[in-house]
Amino acid sequence: MPQEVKRCVLAYSGGLDTSCILAWLIEEGWEVICYMANVGQEEDWDAAREKALKVGAKKVYVEDLREEFINDTVIPAAQANAIYENVYLLGTSLARPIIARRQIQIAEKENCIAVSHGCTGKGNDQVRFELAYYALKPDVQVIAPWRLPVFFERFAGRKDLLEYAAAKGIPVTQTTKKPWSMDENIVHCSYEAGILEDPSMTPPKDMWKLTVDPKDAPDEVEELSIHFEKGAPTKLECKDGTFSGVVSIFYQLNAIARRNGVGRIDIVENRFSGLKSRGCYETPGLTILRTAHMDLEGLTMEREVRALRDQFVTFNLAKILYNGQFFSPCTRMLLAANNVSQEVVNGVVKLSVYKGNVTVLGRKSDTAHLYDEKLSSMDELGGFDPTWTSGFIQIESMRLRNSDEGKHWM
């Protein structure tokens, strides 16, 4: 009897690593379906498809996931003001659940028993992809070549891969390899490894792809306005026109931030594994969006609701996203809580951008009633009785007076 064919879906980029992994999987007896996810990165999709078929892929899927990516992870993260270790806006982390989910959907459609990826054995992405795989399809077989001795002992580095590619007739674009690795999507671009592994080294000017050097940005201030409904952007008004629809808004925010040098960071972060890693990130449009969103929350959200959201949702959602646990009960709970907090976040924020900086110029909301101009005014009482404050201060000071704490501070 003929042996049953083993079928696998490979997350394919068209680069040297995944092209060699494709050939190796075929060599190992797998029938491979290649899958490429368009999450907003620059890519010659037709050339990559042709390359995969030439190497031996049975079929190639090219999936446009940009709108799904923005709606399902980017906007919820922005509504929660999610940020990892106070600086990283999670651009890579946000894309991985969306990419992994479609890979599993294709695996089920094509009756594949396995999925594969080209992530290295030290990074975060292997964890993010595989936790998503197992959450969505617990019985799936995962092939991670860079963790298999049979693979990494054979292919110690780029030289071995190039020799294998030549032997297998895999077309390799002869370009000078940049001394760092990159990952790009509609939200950001990351740079790490190579020369960047020295945390004291200043990144070369030509590394940054998405934004101009702030010193080279225009000398004129550029203004824009972002409209929000329930914490999500619905309209962008700027000198280039009016834009609606999440993908259009993000592309335009990226264009504004790009020409004004907004959204660069250079950090050392803590990976899920405990290793420290140096990363340089450009997150242009999302940096502007987050600034506007946080400002509008100041006008529209009740103080204690915002404090609870900041302490529990913001911190924990960022950690969950970074650690690859998006498809978990915790995420559903956190997003449900955050959705309630965002019901009142409606309005418009006016901003300016200038040489790497984002500044809020004003905000307004037709539905928020927490801010009372007369009640807050220093020029009129507006219904506020100053004598109320005396009792408030007496009550608040009671525990301080009774604590005998003053002796430690005098």
From Swiss-Prot:
Assign the protein's first listed, main location to one coarse class: cytoplasm
Binding-site residues, L-citrulline: 88, 93, 124, 128, 181, 190, 269, 281
Top-rank taxon, per record: Eukaryota
Instruction: State any GO CC term.
Output: cytosol
Q: In which pathway does it act?
A: Amino-acid biosynthesis; L-arginine biosynthesis; L-arginine from L-ornithine and carbamoyl phosphate: step 2/3
What SUPFAM superfamilies would the database entry show?
Answer: Adenine nucleotide alpha hydrolases-like, Argininosuccinate synthetase, C-terminal domain
Q: Which Pfam families match?
A: Arginosuc_syn_C, Arginosuc_synth
Under catalytic activity, the entry for this protein gives: L-citrulline + L-aspartate + ATP = 2-(N(omega)-L-arginino)succinate + AMP + diphosphate + H(+)
**Record EC number:** 6.3.4.5
Q: Where would you find this protein in the cell? A: Cytoplasm
Q: Which GO terms describe its molecular function?
A: argininosuccinate synthase activity; ATP binding
Phenotype upon gene inactivation: Causes arginine auxotrophy.
Q: What is this protein called?
A: Argininosuccinate synthase
Could you say which residues form the signal peptide?
A: none
* Chain sites annotated for binding L-aspartate: 120, 124-125
Q: Which gene encodes it?
A: arg12
The record, for HAMAP family, names: Arg_succ_synth_type1
Query: Of which family is this protein a member?
Result: Belongs to the argininosuccinate synthase family. Type 1 subfamily.
- Which CDD domains does the UniProt record give? ASS
Among PANTHER family, the record links this protein to: ARGININOSUCCINATE SYNTHASE
Keyword Glycoprotein present in the record's keywords: the answer is no
Protein source organism: Schizosaccharomyces pombe (strain 972 / ATCC 24843)
Q: How does it assemble?
A: Homotetramer.
